[in-house]
Amino acid sequence: MNLNFMPLLHAYNHASIDFHFNSSARDFCVHEVPLYEFSNTGEHAVIQVRKSGLSTLEMLQIFSQILGVKIAELGYAGLKDKNALTTQFISLPKKYAPLLEKNTHNLQERNLKILSLNYHHNKIKLGHLKGNRFFMRFKKMTPLNAQKTKQVLEQIARFGMPNYFGSQRFGKFNDNHKEGLKILQNQTKFAHQKLNAFLISSYQSYLFNALLSKRLEISKIISAFSLKENLEFFKQNNLSVNSNALKALKNQAHPFKILEGDVMCHYPYGKFFDALELGKEGERFLNKEAAPTGLLDGKKALYAKNLSFEIEKEFQHNLLSSHAKTLGSRRFFWVFAENVTSQYMKEKAQFELGFYLPKGSYASALLKKIKHEKGEKYDKF
């Protein structure tokens, strides 16, 4: 497979929308929503921290330096953007809590502010969040483009959007996935095991994005072309589909088509199950009750069946499925933005947007859906 970045297909077919977005603390805000309520008792202090101009890892280093706590003792649910105003929850051993108030000024000098202090019985771990609330401000937005943007947002609110991994996964030079493959091939290795694991996960992410783009292409072809043309397309691609199955696929109201053998998952979380009754699953997908998932290949990955598997197998890799430390998983192909709000200020030519996404989903993916830039290969922030 070609490992160079290829343009990823967009979900919707509107023309490009021109505006300016600057990923900065003024124009981009991220607010973490915790997975559970904190009990206010326990051996771990839980602080809600607001930061700007710092990555999560840089923030942890500052806490370590100022409080004397080891970085390994700090818990966090996920990485937050550096070029944004973000809030997130951090856990640390209870004994360090008294030092927080004493060092308020030192922390504020480093662009960190403690918003709240609580306690809990366990350390926060990666993935311990429901999702994130986002705010974005677009500039140089004309009234016509504001109207187009609202129309796109209506589509996204109704149908959702592709759950592509964002550029954070692939690094400054968009080559993390290549390094991950080299690690699997024993061509390179780093001393830090977490770095090796992250780079391998970048390769998984690259394959997932490519698979999702392929599935979008197939969905668009099913919707746009006649039954006869579709039968010819599937035949040329060595995919076995009869005319009745294709009719059923064309009748699915959602733009992303559920295929026979897809691995579904209750949305926004729940158990995996196979798509057997496509009409029924299509309705559940449309109602945001369940969604199809894509492969993150690994030793214990759950694979699709039938037609879905025939497409998916092109994006599997035996080095992932045989790698002892890469267990594999599945990820929603599609996610639904919630609580979408927008406001256009004509006199300032500015458009403000707020929305919520579940954990693991990227605001940059929604930005791409709106801008719809031709030839776009990866996210701008």
UniProtKB/Swiss-Prot annotation:
| Any Pfam family the entry gives | TruD
Q: Has UniProt tagged this entry with the keyword Isomerase?
A: yes
Q: Which GO terms describe its biological process?
A: tRNA pseudouridine synthesis
In this chain the TRUD domain maps to: 160-335
Broad class of enzyme this protein falls into: isomerase
Superkingdom, taxonomy of origin: Bacteria
Task: Provide a GO CC annotation, any one.
Answer: cytosol
The cross-references to InterPro entries, in alphabetical order and at most eight, read: PsdUridine_synth_cat_dom_sf, PsdUridine_synth_TruD, PsdUridine_synth_TruD_CS, PsdUridine_synth_TruD_insert, TruD_catalytic, TruD_pseudoU_synthase
Which residues are the signal sequence here?
A: none
What EC numbers are recorded for this enzyme?
Answer: 5.4.99.27
Q: Which GO terms describe its molecular function?
A: RNA binding; tRNA pseudouridine(13) synthase activity
Q: Show the active-site residues.
A: 81
What is catalyzed by this enzyme? uridine(13) in tRNA = pseudouridine(13) in tRNA
- Similarity-based family: Belongs to the pseudouridine synthase TruD family.
Protein name, as recorded:
tRNA pseudouridine synthase D
Question: Native species of this protein?
Answer: Helicobacter pylori (strain P12)
